């Protein structure tokens, strides 16, 4: 009985029953889990990453034998102050790569295994056949002949050459950078490396097919590009060469000037041909010939001292759009670092970060097939830092932040980039607006047919000025007989010949501030205004009962191709003096006020006619326009008089202040003053009171009450 009771108690125990059910549920879950795992389907099988670029290393070309080409020392001073194209240039780059762990070569002896990031590409001498793809046989034989020349002969050829030097190792050394550049490009094209850096010398982009020049013996990049196109016709049909050396690569350009397989783009100082190599071939309007027309682009710096802002602007506005449209199979950078900050030859301020950013952008072209080949660069520290930044980006590092990302490009550079875009838009769709205004094609010159169905804006501006001055102040036209100019070129107050005191205002056609429609190119008339800088001076003179002559010099007459506003200004002022002003019986005091380029007419008149009896002062607002010297043909003392009686107001950033900060322009330019602001409208507003006070002083009409 007791046992029956115990059994019944156990069966009726709720805790025991719950425990049993939990265990059963757990066993069931385990069973279901096992069944689920055994039946789970494979959707994507495990596989190797389908990428080719990232796993590859960056190739590196370097060979100590390239340092054997050196200048023969003829004095102790050449030893302590070596030639800029110093053999140590490539050593310093190789050394900084090792110091930063990009290569593993603690002895700097050129070991074969460079580590996990870079792959050594053996350097070989280019063959004669490879060099002859670019250079003439005569040039090759001349460089080869230097091997057996005497010291005296080598010095003689160095003296005769165009900024080149020779020794007995020059020929052997010069074949190595050619061969190294070829092998660096081959390694990229064949997929053995993702990109490559050729640390080579002597440089090459100045070497023309028939002659050495500018420290260059053979054109390394041109030889490499020619041979790659020849040997890899299926995989490489188009090559883009980007030359960011501060000097124009005249040799490279000449090698491909008639070739549509190579797009050559060069960013360099030009400055009206004053900067080496100083040939017209470096001008921005040199676009190629024959099949190569449109495949040459020179982005010329009109001033020195350019930096990150200018190079980034050029890349964003010109280089990258052209590169994307060209779709190259290989990109080669002619990588001179003489635009780097600290290089005394280039005198520019490009930072290592900027070189990194430019490299990063070019990596986006040609599926990353990029080869960087050293050209110039003569500050050993600057060239090393810049090359390190480029190498890091090649390996895969993002570029460093730009030191001053908010800096604006120089105005002269912005204008030049616009000229390049307008010119190149003839060949490249990326520079043409797909929804442009159908009324005119602004890439074509304005001609009679366009004028016949459209109304030139500068004509409308002058007509508005004429109506205003006529309606408000009774101005009349002063005829310019036999001069092919608009009738309203010269306006004046009535009875001007009877005036004792005359203000003569000579100005360019007024500017317009306007919002432009980015799609159609039209301007928003409701928010557009004419900036008439001359009106304040006219009203000021009228308040004092002065006679006023207002001279408007058109920017262009459209019809004649050889029209020059500057020359027209000179002719008009001479005409006014010879036919009107010198015959005015009452005139005793004249003040000239020039605004813009047209002020050159005033300076021309003062040098060609003796007006000092009545001319009391000259005020010129030139903004960013070029200074015009007074050339005295009547009296050598005119320059001194002009300096004492003139005020020439320039932009704060005018080029005359950059050339030599410590020196003022010479007296023949007048008394040139640097304003605090830029832009004609701003400097006139800033210096209006100073200018008018100077006129009153010269007229001897100043009083304390005024």
Curated annotation (Swiss-Prot):
GO MF terms, alphabetically ordered: chromatin binding; histone deacetylase activity, hydrolytic mechanism; identical protein binding
Top-tier EC class: hydrolase
GO biological process: epigenetic regulation of gene expression; negative regulation of transcription by RNA polymerase II; negative regulation of transcription by transcription factor localization; positive regulation of transcription by RNA polymerase II
Region (Disordered): 1-36
Active-site residues from the entry: 206
Subcellular localization(s) per the UniProt record: Nucleus
EC number: 3.5.1.98
Name recorded for this polypeptide: Histone deacetylase HDA1
Species this chain originates from: Saccharomyces cerevisiae (strain ATCC 204508 / S288c)
């Amino acid at each position: 009985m007791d046992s029956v009771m115990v059994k019944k108690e156990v069966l009726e125990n709720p805790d025991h029953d719950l425990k049993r059910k939990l265990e059963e549920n757990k066993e069931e879950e385990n069973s279901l889990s096992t069944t689920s795992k055994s039946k789970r389907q494979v959707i994507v099988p495990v596989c190797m990453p389908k990428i080719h670029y990232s796993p590859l290393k960056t190739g590196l070309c370097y060979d100590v034998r390239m340092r054997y080409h050196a200048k023969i020392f003829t004095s102790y001073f050449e030893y302590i102050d070596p030639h800029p194209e110093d053999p140590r240039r490539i050593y310093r780059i190789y050394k900084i790569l090792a110091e930063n762990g990009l290569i593993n070569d603690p002895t700097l002896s050129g070991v074969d295994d460079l580590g996990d990031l870079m792959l050594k590409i053996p350097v070989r001498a280019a063959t004669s056949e490879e060099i002859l793809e670019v250079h003439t046989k005569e040039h090759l034989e001349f460089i080869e002949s230097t091997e057996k020349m005497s010291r005296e002969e080598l010095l003689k050829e160095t003296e005769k050459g165009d900024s080149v030097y020779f020794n007995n190792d020059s020929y052997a050394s010069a074949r190595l950078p050619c061969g190294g550049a070829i092998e660096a490009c081959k390694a990229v094209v064949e997929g053995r490396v993702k990109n490559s850096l050729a640390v080579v010398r002597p440089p090459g982009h100045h070497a023309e097919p028939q002659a050495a020049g500018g420290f260059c013996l053979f054109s390394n990049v041109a030889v490499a590009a020619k041979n790659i196109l020849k040997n890899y016709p299926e995989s490489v049909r188009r090559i883009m060469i980007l030359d960011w050396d501060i000097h124009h690569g005249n040799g490279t350009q000449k090698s491909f000037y008639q070739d549509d397989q190579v797009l050559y783009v060069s960013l360099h100082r030009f400055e009206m041909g004053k900067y080496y190599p100083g040939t017209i071939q470096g001008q921005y309007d040199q676009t190629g010939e024959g099949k190569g027309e449109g495949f040459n682009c020179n982005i010329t710096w009109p001033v020195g001292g350019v930096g990150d802002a200018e190079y980034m602007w050029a890349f964003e506005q010109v280089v990258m759009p052209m590169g994307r449209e060209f779709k190259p199979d290989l990109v080669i950078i002619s990588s001179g670092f003489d635009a780097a900050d600290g290089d005394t030859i280039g005198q520019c301020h490009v930072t290592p970060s900027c070189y990194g950013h430019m490299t990063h952008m070019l990596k986006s072209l040609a599926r990353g097939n990029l080869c960087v080949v050293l050209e110039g660069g003569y500050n050993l520290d600057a060239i090393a830092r810049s090359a390190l930044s480029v190498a890091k980006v090649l390996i895969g590092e993002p570029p460093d932040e730009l030191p001053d990302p908010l800096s604006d490009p120089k105005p002269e550079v912005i204008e030049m980039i616009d000229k390049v875009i307008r010119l190149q838009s003839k060949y490249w769709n990326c520079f043409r607006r797909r929804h442009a205004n159908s009324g005119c094609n602004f890439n074509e010159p304005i001609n009679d047919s366009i004028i016949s169905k459209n109304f030139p804006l500068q004509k409308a501006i002058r007509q508005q000025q004429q109506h205003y001055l006529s309606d408000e102040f009774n101005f009349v036209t002063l005829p310019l007989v036999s001069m092919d100019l608009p009738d309203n070129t010269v306006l004046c107050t009535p009875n001007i010949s009877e005036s004792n005191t005359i203000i003569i205002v000579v100005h360019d056609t007024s500017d317009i501030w306007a919002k432009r429609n980015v799609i159609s190119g039209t301007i928003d008339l409701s928010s557009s205004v004419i900036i008439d800088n001359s009106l304040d001076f006219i009203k000021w003179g009228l308040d004092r009962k002065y006679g006023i002559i207002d001279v408007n010099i058109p920017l262009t007459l459209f019809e004649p191709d050889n029209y020059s506003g500057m020359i027209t200004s000179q002719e008009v002022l001479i005409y006014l003096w010879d036919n009107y002003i010198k015959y005015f019986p009452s005139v005793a005091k004249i003040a000239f006020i020039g605004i813009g380029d047209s002020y050159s007419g005033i300076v021309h008149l003062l040098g060609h006619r003796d007006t000092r009896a009545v001319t009391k002062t000259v005020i010129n607002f030139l903004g960013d326009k070029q200074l015009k010297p007074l050339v005295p043909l009547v009296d050598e003392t005119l320059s001194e008089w002009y300096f004492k009686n003139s005020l020439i107001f320039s932009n704060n950033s005018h080029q005359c202040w950059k050339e030599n900060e410590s020196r003022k322009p010479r007296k023949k330019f007048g008394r040139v003053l640097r304003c605090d602001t830029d832009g004609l409208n701003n400097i006139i507003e800033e210096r209006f009171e100073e200018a008018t006070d100077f006129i009153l002083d010269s007229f001897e009409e100043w009083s304390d009450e005024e």
